[in-house]
Amino acid sequence: MEFDPVKINTSSIDHVTILQYIDEPNDIRLTVCIIRNINNITYYINITKINPHLANRFRAWKKRIAGRDYMTNLSRDTGIQQSKLTETIRNCQKNKNIYGLYIHYNLVINVVIDWITDVIVQSILRGLVNWYIANNTYTPNTPNNTTTISELDIIKILDKYEDMYRVSKEKECGICYEVVYSKRLENDRYFGLLDSCNHIFCITCINIWHRTRRETGALDNCPICRTRFRKITMSKFYKLVN
């Protein structure tokens, strides 16, 4: 059976391209998620979405001598660190359609594809990957000293902020004992972070504490642990995000 580009449906979620190959007369449905990494101008393919067993087998293969040698050689030939030849998007509600193990397309075409027993699926997968790469060739137009951010990096950043928000929205101020995000005034819904400890305060309460201490000539210290601090940082999250 020949690969037919007409049967491809393309969509995207959070910088992930989703290719769906649908051939209803032959009862064939194949979904391939691809991320194009602009930093090293290559492509990463989600093998979990193709078949979860492929991801498990890849992890086992990578630990064996043949896998380690292949990864070492691929890293050398591409100039990409071994740790950057694979990426993972975690499973959560926001990522339910794109989560999984993404690996360098070379690993898919030259290694993983041979683990697929259905030769028709093999052929279609190879055709999908080659079709996508041929139609999405990237030519850099930024100066060599300009650092670009990849789609995977963007997703990781969004995940980090989502996690930080989820934890922050439950935090209470250690002075007024109110949930910081539930305060009546919007300007009060910020944390005041001390550089000396990790105790939680809303920006309003810790500023009042700080001002009162200054007015009375007392030391600037944490209301809970009494550790002296030098500055207060206003933040939307309960701790600084690196």
Swiss-Prot record:
Main localization of the protein described in the UniProt heading: host cell
Q: Which keywords label this protein?
A: Host cytoplasm, Host-virus interaction, Metal-binding, Modulation of host cell apoptosis by virus, Modulation of host ubiquitin pathway by viral E3 ligase, Modulation of host ubiquitin pathway by virus, Transferase, Ubl conjugation pathway, Zinc, Zinc-finger
Protein's cellular compartments: Host cytoplasm
- In this chain, the RING-type zinc fingers fall at 173-226
Gene3D superfamilies, per the entry: Zinc/RING finger domain, C3HC4 (zinc finger)
Q: Which reaction does it catalyse?
A: S-ubiquitinyl-[E2 ubiquitin-conjugating enzyme]-L-cysteine + [acceptor protein]-L-lysine = [E2 ubiquitin-conjugating enzyme]-L-cysteine + N(6)-ubiquitinyl-[acceptor protein]-L-lysine
Instruction: Return the GO cellular component terms, semicolon-separated.
Output: host cell cytoplasm
Q: What is its EC number?
A: 2.3.2.27
Q: Which GO terms describe its biological process?
A: protein polyubiquitination; symbiont-mediated perturbation of host apoptosis; symbiont-mediated perturbation of host ubiquitin-like protein modification
InterPro entries xrefs: E3_ubiquitin-prot_ligase_p28 (IPR016398), KilA/APSES_HTH (IPR018004), KilA_N (IPR017880), MKRN-like (IPR045072), Znf_RING (IPR001841), Znf_RING/FYVE/PHD (IPR013083), Znf_RING_CS (IPR017907)
Origin: domain of life: Viruses
**What Pfam families does the record point to?**
KilA-N, zf-RING_2
Q: Does the keyword Magnesium apply?
A: no
**SMART domains recorded:** RING
Residues in domain KilA-N? Answer: 21-131
Quote one Gene Ontology molecular function term: ubiquitin protein ligase activity
First and last residue of the signal peptide: none
Which SUPFAM superfamilies is this protein grouped with?
RING/U-box
Record PANTHER family: IP09428P-RELATED, MAKORIN-RELATED
Q: Which family does it belong to?
A: Belongs to the orthopoxvirus OPG021 family.
Which function does this protein serve? RING-finger E3 ubiquitin ligase which catalyzes the formation of both 'Lys-48'- and 'Lys-63'-linked polyubiquitin chains. Plays an important role in virulence by acting as an anti-apoptotic factor.
The entry's protein name is Host range factor p28
